[in-house]
Amino acid sequence: MSPIQAFGPQAENQSPPFSGHNAYRADPLLKDIAADMPRALRDDFETVGKFVASAEAQDLARIANRAVPELKTHDGYGNRIDQVDFHPSWHALMRRSVSSGLQGSVWEGRREEKGFAHQARALRFFLTAGLECGHLCPLTMTNASIAAIMASPRIEKAWAPQVVSRRYDSSNRPAMQKSGVTIGMGM
């Protein structure tokens, strides 16, 4: 015990931090579901499982849930902007989840996911939900929006590449000027 700890109250009934493992490897059901999937997908699940159980990811999730989004109605010059600013930890989680395809991998048509696209997304989603659920809401809405977008070939041509893009773009620009878009959270 360090000299500093000797003077403060000691918490004896707390579990140690739950990080540093692999959430995918630790779940026999997930491994069983993925057993017949291509090796590339199983490797991806390993990567997601390691990240979501890392201390870094858990810190991002904790901070993202404590740092409330802030509405900025005007810029410094009095111009109306109606912009919502999220903490960088929120953007880090979004960036990671978008790069994993949670916003639209089922619509990409990737060869390694052929026949497994929905199951692969569900497995990644399940693992990520164990970390933080709030950022999954806009990703779920984005994934669901593609079916409606596909109802119009003209709209699909314009929007689908932006929506299924695995590049998260948090900039406050028109959608067609962004490298990727999410659809949702316009409440």
Identify the residue ranges that each predicted region occupies.
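Glycine-rich flavin
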Residues: 91-187
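Extended, charge-enriched "interface" segments that sit outside catalytic cores
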Residues: 1-114
